[in-house]
Each structure stands twice: as structure tokens, then as C-alpha cells.
């Protein structure tokens, strides 16, 4: 299932800020970047949504898999997982999260991948 609009991270300025200044947490199959939310970087139509809520994005390059079907399956799996985890996150969770998958992610089963995602979210302090 796809992330709701209020939880989606959009805009090149947001991604640039996360890439440059975000705190990085490394796993074997993914890198999690976290930064405190800055609603001023959001485009005007998206600012009216809950600007201080957690917003997420998942980046999967063609190095992970040349097949779009596999990349989209991984993206949907992670979106669904992030949605279930961050919807129950504390109200003070006003961070932006970017998950970048490494090429080894396509060879890993679903449950270890999601467990690693949870571990990185705990390291980042987004889950208790």
C-alpha cells in the first residue's frame, strides 16, 4: 500500500537537504537518513498537510534490480512497513526519513529487510 500524501516526502530541495545534512544510519541492505522537518522546504500545496508529521521516501536505484517490477515490489513493501510503524509513532516525531536500498537488498527476503528497517528506525530514535 502506498504512503498517504501527508506522509510522503516530495521535492528536490527536501531530498538535497537529507542527502547533505541528514544523519545516516547504515545497515547491510539499506541506508536510513533522518533530519528534523523543515516545512519551509515543502512546496506550497503540500505545506497545509500536517507539516510537522513524519514524512518518508524510499529510493531504489536500478543497481538494486534492473527490473522495475522488483524495485516497485520492494518500494511497496517498505512503504507499507513505514506506514504501519510511523503512524503509531509519538506526536513529537517531526522528522523526515529517506531510505536508500543497497544493491544486495534484492537478494534478501522480506522479513530480514523489514527487521533491518525497524532496527535502523530504533537507532534513529523514531521508534520506542
Swiss-Prot record:
EC numbers, comma separated:
3.1.26.5
Task: Output the Gene Ontology terms for molecular function.
Answer: 3'-tRNA processing endoribonuclease activity; ribonuclease P activity; tRNA binding
Task: State the superkingdom.
Answer: Bacteria
Extract one GO BP annotation from the record: tRNA 5'-leader removal
EC main group? hydrolase
Please give the catalytic activity noted in the UniProt record.
Endonucleolytic cleavage of RNA, removing 5'-extranucleotides from tRNA precursor
Coiled coil segments of this chain? none
- Report the sequence similarity comment from the record: Belongs to the RnpA family.
Quaternary state and interactors: Consists of a catalytic RNA component (M1 or rnpB) and a protein subunit.
List the protein's name.
Ribonuclease P protein component
Protein's organism: Prochlorococcus marinus (strain MIT 9303)
- Tell me the name of the encoding gene: rnpA
Amino acid at each position: 500500500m502506498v504512503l498517504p500524501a501527508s506522509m510522503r516526502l516530495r521535492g528536490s530541495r527536501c531530498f538535497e537537504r537529507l542527502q547533505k545534512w541528514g544523519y545516516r544510519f547504515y545497515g547491510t541492505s539499506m541506508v536510513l537518513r533522518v533530519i528534523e522537518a523543515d516545512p519551509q522546504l515543502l512546496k506550497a500545496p503540500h505545506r497545509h498537510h500536517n507539516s510537522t508529521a513524519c514524512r518518508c521516501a524510499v529510493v531504489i536505484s536500478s543497481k538494486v534490480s534492473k527490473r522495475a517490477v522488483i524495485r516497485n515490489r520492494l518500494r511497496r513493501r517498505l512503504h507499507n512497513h513505514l506506514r504501519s510503524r510511523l503512524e503509531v509513532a509519538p506526536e513529537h516525531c517531526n522528522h523526515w526519513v529517506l531510505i536508500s536500498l543497497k544493491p544486495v537488498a534484492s537478494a534478501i527476503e522480506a522479513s530480514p529487510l523489514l527487521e533491518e528497517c525497524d532496527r535502523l528506525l530504533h537507532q534513529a530514535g523514531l521508534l520506542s
